[in-house]
Each structure stands twice: as structure tokens, then as C-alpha cells.
A protein has these predicted regions:
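ABC-family P-loop ATPase nucleotide-binding domain
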Residues: 1-14, 223-231
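ABC family nucleotide-binding domain
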Residues: 5-6, 11-216
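Residue-level detector of flexible, active-site-proximal loop/helix-junction positions
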Residues: 80, 220, 228
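H-loop (His-switch) and adjacent beta-strand-loop-beta switch element
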Residues: 213-225
């Protein structure tokens, strides 16, 4: 069997100190097969977004093993984690996190340039055209609709050609129709590249469209079903 894209083993994570210490993730163990899509749902405060931050190398765990793309994130220093994020993980958030003074093209190209890609602007142009924004390359975020800004964010996430795409409520700030377009783009990109998609959402129907649905509650997985059972 091929190595999983993601594997967590007995992961614990707490935030705060002393009496204010809160257990966010509790003894989590699961794996995600490469090239599949997983929708994670659960009430607010269940640990969904924190789990994504762990998978993206943006949050440290207290104990346990975190393996993503064959690399042990829990053993990496900050510089190694930054390099890992730059080459292996694409991240899309609910809020678009675009630089307001940069054009759409620059928002996608500059992170690539900083990671040493010489073809940064050409790659950025290709990705923006793939998400339907070839005609908006020189527009700034303020000149773009919410849906267009999220398309820029998706292009930016996909430009380094990551093996794993992580999305935290990517349609949360969008109307229903625009949200559907954004999700279709992400699923198409996943299939086209053979990437693994891990998606946190409040939308049960969206989670059910994934190959697998995981339900979290109070930092634990309480349900884990394949697509056939999720429908």
C-alpha cells in the first residue's frame, strides 16, 4: 500500500496555562489516503480548524506524531516547517488574506518568487487563468468581488503545485452560487493534480461530496465514514 498523505498518531494539543488550559485535540489518530478528499465537520470549538493548522505546520502539538507528505512535522524546526509549507501544502482560508497593494497576479507570484521559483509570474498567470481570472490579472483586491478574491487565493494555494490542499471554510464569506463555483474549482484542481484535499466546513452537503466525512466533537473524532455511507 502507498504511504498515506496524512497520518496522525496519538496527537494531543492544549492551549493556555494552568486552570485556563483547554484541551483542543485529544489523542487523535487517523490517516488520509493520498489523492482523496476529506470533509471535516463539527460544531464550533470542536477542534476542526486547529487540526488543519496542525496539518499545515502552523500549530505545534504537545505530543504525538504528525506525518504529512512523508515528513514528520512534529520533529521539524521553524525554518524546515516554512520550507515544507512552501513546497508541499496549499492553504485556503475563509478570509482571503490577499495583499491589498498587490495585483491579483502579484498576490500569486510574489510568494512563489520568495520561495525561489524563477517562473513565478508565468506560473501565477497559468493558475489565474485556470480559475477564470485571466482577464483580471492587473486588478487589486478592492476591485474584485468576494468570489474573485477567493479564486485568487485558490490560485495562490495551487501555484506551488502542492501535494496537499487544505481549506478552512473556503465558502464561508460567499453566496451559495459563488460558493458552489469555488468548491467545483477546488475539486477539479484536486483531480487534475492528484492532490489530497482536506476541507473544514459547516456545510454537511459539501462534506458529503468528499470521498470521506469526519465528524469532530470536543477535540475527538466521533464519526468517520466513506462517501457511500455519507450520501
Amino acid at each position: 500500500l502507498p504511504d498515506p498523505a496524512v497520518a496522525l498518531s496519538q496527537v494531543d494539543l492544549s492551549l493556555g496555562n494552568g486552570a485556563a488550559r483547554v484541551h483542543i485535540l485529544k489523542n487523535l489518530s487517523f490517516s488520509i489516503e493520498a489523492g482523496t478528499s476529506v470533509g471535516i465537520v463539527g460544531p464550533s470549538g470542536s477542534g476542526k480548524s486547529t487540526l488543519l493548522m496542525v496539518l499545515a505546520g502552523l500549530e505545534r502539538v504537545d505530543s504525538g506524531a504528525v506525518t504529512v507528505g512523508g515528513e514528520r512535522l512534529d520533529r521539524m524546526g521553524e525554518d524546515a516547517l516554512a520550507r515544507f509549507r512552501g513546497r508541499s501544502v496549499g492553504i485556503v482560508f475563509q478570509s482571503f488574506h490577499l495583499m491589498p497593494t498587490m495585483t491579483a497576479l502579484e498576490n500569486v507570484a510574489v510568494p512563489l518568487e520568495l520561495s525561489g521559483r524563477r517562473d513565478a509570474f508565468e506560473r501565477a498567470r497559468i493558475e489565474l487563468e485556470a480559475v477564470g481570472l485571466g482577464h483580471r490579472l492587473n486588478h487589486h483586491p478592492a476591485e474584485l468581488s468576494g468570489g474573485e478574491q477567493q479564486r485568487v487565493a485558490i490560485a495562490r494555494a495551487l501555484a506551488p503545485e502542492p501535494s496537499i490542499l487544505i481549506a478552512d471554510e473556503p465558502t464561508g464569506n460567499l453566496d451559495t452560487e459563488t460558493g458552489r463555483d469555488i468548491i467545483r474549482l477546488m475539486f477539479e484542481a484536486r483531480v487534475r493534480r492528484g492532490a489530497t484535499l482536506v476541507l473544514v466546513t459547516h456545510d454537511r452537503a459539501l462534506a458529503d461530496a468528499c470521498d470521506r466525512r469526519i465528524v469532530m466533537r470536543s477535540g475527538e473524532i466521533v464519526e468517520d465514514v466513506q462517501a457511500e455511507a455519507a450520501q
